[in-house]
Amino acid sequence: MAAWDLLFRRVHLATFAGDEPYGALRDGALAVRTGRIEWLGAERDLPREARAAQEIDGAGGWLLPGLIDCHTHLVHAGNRAREFELRMQGANYEEIARAGGGIRVTVIATRAADEAALVVASRPRLARLIAEGVTTVEIKSGYGLELSAERRMLRAARALGDTAPVRVTTTFLGAHALPPEYDGRADDYIAEVCDVMLPALYREGLVDAVDAFCERIAFSPAQTEAVFRAARALGLPVRLHAEQLSDSGGAALAARYGALCADHLEHLSEAGAAALAAAGSVAVLLPGAFYFLRETHLPPAARLRALGVPVAIATDCNPGTSPLSSLLLALNMACVLFRLSPAAALAGVTRNAARALGRGDDLGTLEAGKLADLGLWNVDTPAELCYHLGYNPLALRVFGGQISGAGDVAQG
C-alpha cells in the first residue's frame, strides 16, 4: 500500500460520530493522506503493511476533531471597557444601547479603521483560539453598517483566513444595529442592506451566509424577513440572533426560512423550539454573553435536546457583551451555566458547530473522507476539556493534514 502522510498510533479517538457520548474508540489509530482522514479504527486492526511519512505516538492521549467556533464578531476595532464599568454600576444592555452606547461605539471605532488595522487588531484574538485547538472560525461583519466599512470587515476576515492555519467562514451582519445616520428610518436602512450592501458584497465573493439581529433594540421580524428574502434570492444560507432579550418570534422565523442556526435563545418559547426541531436548524448557545451580561433567564438547553435540536456552543467573541477568545472557557461555562454534559458541550464545538456552518459533510467528526483537522489532547478523558479552568491541555494541532499551531499565524 502507498504510504500515508500522517499516522497517529496509541491514541483514543473521540469521533463524535454515532449516538454514543464522544463516539469513543479506545486504543485507536488514525491515518491521513492529502489532507483528509483515510483510515481510522482500532490500532490492532491497522493493515500489517501500514506505513506513513510521519508517525505520531499519541501516548494514550485523546484525538478529537478540530474545534469549531461557529459564532464570533472577532473582527472589530476598539473595546468597550467603559461600558463594562457602567454595567458594573447597574446599567443594563438595553439602557446602554438606548443611550447611544453599545454596538454604536464599536461602529465608530471600526469605521475609522482601515483593513490593515482591522487585521492587526483581530489577529491576536484569532491566535488565542488557534492555540486552543480551533481549526474553523465563523466571523461576522456588522460593525460597519455601511458598504465600505462592511466590506473592510469581511475582507479582513478573509485575510485572516488566508494567513493563518484556520478555516474562516464569513457572515454578513449588516442588520446588526441601526446606524446613527438612519435614526428613525429603520425600514430605509433595511432597504439599503438588502438592495445595495448585500448584492455588492456577494458579487465580490465576501459572503458565505447572512445574519440579522431580531430584537426590540434592533430589527423587527418583518425587517428581518426582508433580509432573509434578499439572502435567499442570492442562494445564500441564513442564520439569526434570536430571543436573546425577549421572545420576538425570531426562532420560528429562522426555522421557516430553513436557517442554518438560531443563536442566543435565552427567551426561546416552546413553539420556537419546536419550529427549530422541525426545520433541522441548530441552536447555538452563547454562554459568554449570558455570563458577561449577568443574565438570569436560561436558554432551554434540556428541552432543545429533548426535541432533537442539535445544540452548538460558541464564544460570541465581541467587544461589548462577550470579550471572550477562549472556546475552552466557553465549554466550561456551557456545562456550569447551561447544565450541558461535557459530551454534549464538546459535540457543540465539533459535530453540531459544523452543522451550524453548513459544513457537516466535511468537518466536525472523525470519519474517513473528512478533512484532517484534528487536535491531540493530553487528557485522560475528553471531559477534561470542559473541566479545567485556565489550562490548555492541547498537545498537537493538525490543520488540513499539516501539524500547525498559533505560532504559524502570520504577523505581517
From Swiss-Prot:
Which residues are involved in binding N-formimidoyl-L-glutamate?
Y143, N318, G320
**InterPro entries assigned to the protein according to its UniProt record, in alphabetical order:** Amidohydro-rel (IPR006680), HutI (IPR005920), Metal-dep_hydrolase_composite (IPR011059), Metal_Hydrolase (IPR032466)
Keyword annotations from UniProtKB, A to Z: Cytoplasm, Histidine metabolism, Hydrolase, Iron, Metal-binding, Zinc
Would the keyword Hydrolase be found if you checked this record's keyword annotation? yes
Class of the enzyme per the UniProt entry, highest EC level: hydrolase
Where does the chain bind 4-imidazolone-5-propanoate? R80, Y143, H176, Q244, T321
Its main localization is cytoplasm
Please list the residues that bind Zn(2+).
H71, H73, H241, D316
The signal peptide stretch is none
Pathway field: Amino-acid degradation; L-histidine degradation into L-glutamate; N-formimidoyl-L-glutamate from L-histidine: step 3/3
Compartments where located: Cytoplasm
This enzyme catalyses: 4-imidazolone-5-propanoate + H2O = N-formimidoyl-L-glutamate
Relay the cofactor remark from the entry.
Answer: Binds 1 zinc or iron ion per subunit.
Instruction: State the GO CC annotations.
Output: cytoplasm
Q: What does this protein do?
A: Catalyzes the hydrolytic cleavage of the carbon-nitrogen bond in imidazolone-5-propanoate to yield N-formimidoyl-L-glutamate. It is the third step in the universal histidine degradation pathway.
Name of this protein: Imidazolonepropionase
